[in-house]
Regions:
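Short, extreme N-terminal segment that most often corresponds to the first beta-strand
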Residues: 2-16, 35, 104
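Acidic, low-complexity, intrinsically disordered interaction modules
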Residues: 21-105
Length: 107
């Protein structure tokens, strides 16, 4: 699981991971919201889970099985991967996570 609070951290990761352009663009766009929330005094993260094990870690750490996302959608990338983007808000001040989870392809 990768957890980011700044655009610089995210960009460094995306370049090193050779992430698909579609994921980069959406994650960078969402990172702006994370930075705004953090500047306002709340705590927010952008989280990327690339495997089932990382997804399970995020689910356990944030008790995601006990809450529903405010927003969720699937991002298709040109390399054939699917990413599920979900937004979870945990507090009235906007604190929460924007979560990107790699969705395994069906056999």
């Amino acid at each position: 699981m990768k957890k980011f609070q700044t655009m610089g951290e995210l960009i460094a990761y995306m370049v090193g991971a050779n992430a698909p352009n579609e994921l980069k663009a959406e994650a960078e766009n969402q990172m702006q919201a994370v930075e705004e929330v953090n500047q306002g005094g709340a705590t927010a993260y952008l989280i990327i889970a690339e495997s089932k094990a990382e997804a399970k870690q995020v689910e356990n750490e944030y008790a995601l099985s006990n809450c529903a996302p405010e927003y969720s959608r699937i991002i298709n990338t040109l390399d054939g991967a699917y990413w599920k983007q979900s937004v979870f808000v945990f507090s009235d001040d906007g604190g929460g996570i924007i979560y990107f989870e790699r969705v395994p392809l069906l056999p």
